[in-house]
Amino acid sequence: MSQTSLKHKKKNEPGMRYSKESLDAEKRKDSDKTGARLSTQGSQELPLHNTDSRGYVVRNQWSRTSRSPSTGAPSVDEPRSRNTAIKVEAPNSSTTSRTSSASPSQHETSPPPQTSEKSSIQQTPQNRPITQLESQPPTPPETEPNSRRTSAKMYTGSDPWAHRENREPRDLQLRDYAYSCDSREGMPKTREYPRTPPTEWKPYAQRRLQYGTSVDMEPEYISDGPQQRQRQQTEEDEVDEAYWTSVSMLYEKIPSCARPRPPKPKHAITIAVSSRALFNMVDDRKIYEEEGLEKYMEYQLTNENVILTPGPAFRFVKALQHVNSRLRDLYPDEQDLFDIVLMTNNHAQVGVRLINSVNHYGLLIDRFCLTGGKSPIGYLKAYLTNLYLSADSEKVQEAIKEGIASATMYAGAKDMAYCDTQLRVAFDGDAVLFSDESEHIAKDHGLDKFFQHETLFENKPLAQGPLKSFLEDLGKLQKKFYAKDERLLCPIRTYLVTARSAASSGARVLKTLRRWGLEIDEALFLAGAPKGPILVKIRPHIFFDDQMFHIESAQKFGTITAHVPYGIAQKRN
């Protein structure tokens, strides 16, 4: 060696000593760092926990800042190296690269590491801890090796019993649940509450009505309440309509249920007929008046299978049924029909004989009212009665006072052939269709004053009488046939048979009908002549009049009459 090189070497010796000491201090400093990383060539890098001066990891289950001994017992499956301490691996190539970059001469002259350092830093792969906790591919190394980072995959060397303590309550729950299931299997299965019987089940429409409107609702739903209720009501109506349609179709297919259903009372023209007006019960009445109620009931029970003979209103009721049949042919869903109600003060025990007689003649009478000796007049308005026909004049007068069109039925003295295809109804004018104001003048002042009065008030309509409403009902049904071009074949025909003179007092009558909007098919002005011969030609099913001598005259010719007890003529009869 030359002297110059020796001089340079001597000059660099202090620097070499300085570099060795710095390397030892740097190694010791790296071992004390909490962020030291384990790295091997081709393996995954994991962050290390805090270490002490000897290089062992300080483990703490709770605070992660202070060192405390673990309370859990070691597991059999755990390796011994994990139960003691984790030894930090020697600095990796990145650490040596920093020292090697100082000068190549330093690597040549640097002595090997001491044995004390080997005891704290081991590089043997046999004692190296397992770095992969899960079967996942290795992650690339961090770009900043000196920065601290926390990973979700912590080293398994932290407390090995932490997961067992967390899972123990869950295991106890599963064990208790399995025990409870096993215990329930052996126990008898009993129901703690009674089963709801099917009779208590109700559809939604009924259950909805049980709850009031006090339920709190959001403001946006409150505004839609009426519309929603309207939609629900419409849906319910559609369901009901479909149900009744299916029921009617079912009944039409059954031969025994082929009879038409009765119309709804609020639309129908209700005709209330007593049992003595519908059937001939003269002999039965004599037994009641002569022998009393008990004998009368015994007689009815004994003869309940004996069919009663037709009474004065029998043919009138048959003609009403023919009109209903014609209306149903033209209007299948028609509700403006005649509805016959049997209204009688007979007892319920007599009802069996009445039902047998009604069915025998094929009368479509579905509603009965048997009052058991009590007057049935109080039920007339409840049945929405338009016309009441009875053989008892006292009950008819009661009904007239109640404002219900009523008449007392009388049979003809001899049989007469009646038309079966057309309902024919004849009316008297004064005190029947019209009021009795004109009769007051005729009775008090004579016929001359009567004619002058009618001429003077020709354009003034007459006041209505008790049967005017029934004529309106007939006219309403007639218009239904006229709408189908059935005027000439209409099954209803009305007649006006009056003792007035057409020349002197007939104009006011016709103008009054015109003002009311009513049509009369035939108007017969007799000028005081008897009505019997005219009625024989008409052959009406019923003739309404307020004077008994006209009733008696018509009876002699066989006409079925109905006396209307209304007006001044009742005081003179």
Curated annotation (Swiss-Prot):
Tissue expression from the record = Expressed at highest levels in testis. Also expressed in brain, skeletal muscle, kidney and heart.
Q: Which reaction does it catalyse?
A: a ribonucleoside 5'-phosphate + H2O = a ribonucleoside + phosphate; AMP + H2O = adenosine + phosphate
Q: Where is the composition biased (Polar residues)?
A: 60-73, 115-136
Please name the catalytic residues of this protein. Answer: 428 (nucleophile)
| Biased amino acid composition, Low complexity | 93-105
Compositional bias, Basic residues, is annotated for 1-11
Instruction: Give the required cofactors.
Output: Mg(2+)
Q: Which UniProt keywords apply?
A: Cytoplasm, Hydrolase, Magnesium, Nucleotide metabolism
In alphabetical order, the GO MF annotations are: 5'-nucleotidase activity; magnesium ion binding; nucleotide binding
Kindly indicate whether the keyword Phosphoprotein belongs to this entry: no
| Enzyme nomenclature, EC number | 3.1.3.5
Which subcellular locations apply to this protein? Cytoplasm
What spans are recorded as compositionally biased (Basic and acidic residues)?
12-35, 161-174, 182-194
Q: How is its activity regulated?
A: Activated by ADP.
From its record, what is one biological process in GO terms? Answer: nucleoside metabolic process
Specify where it is mainly localized: cytoplasm
Regarding protein family, the annotation reads: Belongs to the 5'-nucleotidase type 3 family.
User: This protein is called what?
Assistant: Cytosolic 5'-nucleotidase 1B
This chain's source organism reads Mus musculus
